[in-house]
Amino acid sequence: MTTPSAAETLASVPALPDAFNYAAHLLAVNAGRPGKAAFVDDAGTLSYGELDERARRLGAGLRLLGLKREERVLLLMHDGTDWPASFLGAMYAGLVPVAVNTLLTADDYAYMLEHSRAQAVLVSGALLPVLNSAMTKSDHEVQKVIVSRPQAPLHPSEVEFEAFLKAYSPLTKPAGTGPDDPG
């Protein structure tokens, strides 16, 4: 019995279709088991059905924010169920997720922001300070930052909420309050 040559083996592999989205493929392959656990983290279990829903919603949200096909989205996120939903959601939207190690320095992230040309960053709340530092060091301007599992409580100088207090007035201005505001 003879072993097929590399050329013969390659010729027998079917070509990819003209349009192929790996995230859509992965979600479709697992559509028949929506209740099965896909990922588990310290906050709980994410089923395949929930992964499908979260990835599609995140992808739609990224597109609604104005991100376009093949633009980069930096994923500076701790391990957890938000990570695969974000990775697949970006891919589902036709974006390019850029996965990075969470143990690096602000200088490393500044370099990655500049060289990946990321238009958005999905960041774990605990890593937001290092991202902010990286963005001040980078010449590349990120358009959108989305925080996963933001940290609380807020610093006294941060606004907790805004409300427009006068309806239908051209002079309406938002009024905000933070922890140290008297009211």
Q: Where is each model-derived feature located?
A:
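Flexible, non-catalytic linker and terminal segments flanking ANL/adenylate-forming cores
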Residues: 1-20
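AMP-dependent adenylate-forming
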Residues: 24-50, 153, 182
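Aromatic/hydrophobic pocket-lining residues that form π-stacking "cages" and hydrophobic walls in ligand
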Residues: 26, 85-86, 131
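Conserved pre-ATP/AMP-binding loop-to-beta segment of ANL
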Residues: 35, 152, 168-183
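Conserved AMP-binding/adenylate-forming core of the ANL superfamily
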Residues: 37-80, 84-88, 105-110, 162-163
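Structural core segment of the AMP-binding/adenylate-forming
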Residues: 64-65, 92-166, 176
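Helix N-cap/beta->alpha junction signal
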Residues: 77-79, 124-125, 181
